[in-house]
């Protein structure tokens, strides 16, 4: 007896990303490689012009702290994209995600072309940022 995706009880959360790469509707949401939900909708936020992704999380996983974060990953080198859920800390006072919540901490997809460009030409911005980070760390 295979239960269809639409029959599974779930709650919806959403998140915005700078770049979703090739992420598609029905792409899996995984925690440690285990599928706990799926992308249910992708649209462009009309105010920010950033991709807004709606995710249906299976109801059985209803104890996910709101301190959790999302990152878009790729299965293998050229495989399908999915969203990895990094479960946040829970100190007993942190609220759990519920229907309609927004996950704020997101990391965009690494686009293969960008990675190749960084490898071939170097990324001057990263080097500048590293120097600034080191200066900031030394001053504290």
Segments (PLM) and residue ranges:
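Surface-exposed connector loops and short turns at secondary-structure junctions
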Residues: 59-67
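Short alpha-helix capping/helix-loop boundary micro-motifs
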Residues: 13-17, 55-58
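Extracytoplasmic/periplasmic terminal helices and flexible tails
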Residues: 1-10, 14, 24-25, 73, ...
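Short beta-strand/strand-turn micro-motif
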Residues: 18-54, 65, 72, 80
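Solvent-exposed, non-transmembrane amphipathic alpha-helical segments
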Residues: 33, 40, 49, 56-59, ...
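Short, surface-exposed acidic/glycine-rich loop or hinge patches that mediate macromolecular interfaces
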Residues: 20, 58-60, 106, 110
């Amino acid at each position: 007896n295979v239960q269809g995706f639409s029959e599974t009880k779930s709650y919806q959360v959403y998140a915005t990303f700078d770049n979703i790469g090739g992420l598609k509707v029905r792409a899996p949401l995984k925690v440690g490689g285990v599928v706990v939900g799926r992308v249910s909708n992708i649209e462009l936020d009309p105010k920010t012009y950033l991709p807004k992704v709606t995710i249906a999380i299976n109801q059985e996983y209803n104890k996910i702290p709101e301190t959790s974060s999302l990152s878009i990953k790729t299965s293998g080198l050229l495989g399908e994209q999915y969203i990895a859920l990094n479960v946040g800390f829970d100190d007993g006072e942190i609220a759990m995600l519920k229907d309609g919540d927004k996950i704020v901490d997101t990391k965009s997809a690494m686009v293969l072309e960008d990675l190749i460009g960084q490898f071939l030409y170097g990324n001057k911005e990263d080097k500048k940022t590293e120097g600034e980070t080191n200066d900031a760390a030394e001053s504290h």
